Amino acid sequence: MYIDSHCHINFPELNEKIDEVLINMENNKISHALCVSVTLDKINEILDLTRKYSNVYASVGVHPDYEDIQEPDIETLFNYSKNEKVIAIGETGLDYFRLKGDLSW
């Protein structure tokens, strides 16, 4: 069995296809999925998915592409991590692959 360690099945373009995606995962021996948040305002959507699907887990954080969004503080991340379906912190860090220019923010 395999685990998809980084997916975004909460994105709007998959709203009508989540069941199909999860069936395809199972058919391809992917037993679990880690749905990674890109902004904290979407975490509740992801947590809803983790409640609906026993094989979906969550990662909480803010993707570095969203430098204009308030970064979460440690306490906020810690509070989310108390949920048994939150098993990772991320998106985080600096995305040197996509971002250009001054990265001092």
Language model feature labels by segment:
Residues 1-105:
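Mid-domain alpha/beta scaffold segments of enzyme catalytic cores
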